[in-house]
Amino acid sequence: MLQNSELLQEYLPIAIFFGIALLVSGLIMILPNLLSTKKYNKDKLEPYECGFEPFSDARSKFDIRFYLVAILFIIFDLEIAFLVPWAISLNMIGKIGFFSMIFFLFVLTIGFIYEWKKGALDW
């Protein structure tokens, strides 16, 4: 079993690495704020909207359906992220991997049908 001094000696390079990483990342975040010139004007503080004047305030409320569509997009985007490696390694993972992905797709399909029946996709 290692004694305390030997244990500290083995972890010293890792501690030094984390210390330097924290120092460098802190400097990268702080130095631009200290060294940059700050010129505030009305045009720089306005939101950009395709070259036109903004029609309304950028911080207006959105309909909840936009959030539901965004969440559904993320869920099905992650489904593709799981399907591609699964399809590539299908011959190596065997029947267990095949049926586990079929179960995963079944659960996602049930969730999609539920969202559809609840009217989350109706506008």
Swiss-Prot record:
Main location (coarse class): membrane
Any GO MF annotation of the entry: quinone binding
A GO CC annotation given for this chain: plasma membrane
InterPro entries xrefs: NAD(P)H_OxRDtase_bac/plastid, NADH_UbQ/plastoQ_OxRdtase_su3, NDAH_ubi_oxred_su3_sf
Coiled-coil segments: none
Transport among keywords: yes
Membrane topology term: Multi-pass membrane protein
Catalytic activity: a quinone + NADH + 5 H(+)(in) = a quinol + NAD(+) + 4 H(+)(out)
Keywords, alphabetical: Cell inner membrane, Cell membrane, Membrane, NAD, Quinone, Translocase, Transmembrane, Transmembrane helix, Transport, Ubiquinone
Subcellular location: Cell inner membrane
PANTHER family: NADH-UBIQUINONE OXIDOREDUCTASE CHAIN 3
Quaternary structure and partners: NDH-1 is composed of 14 different subunits. Subunits NuoA, H, J, K, L, M, N constitute the membrane sector of the complex.
Name assigned to this protein: NADH-quinone oxidoreductase subunit A
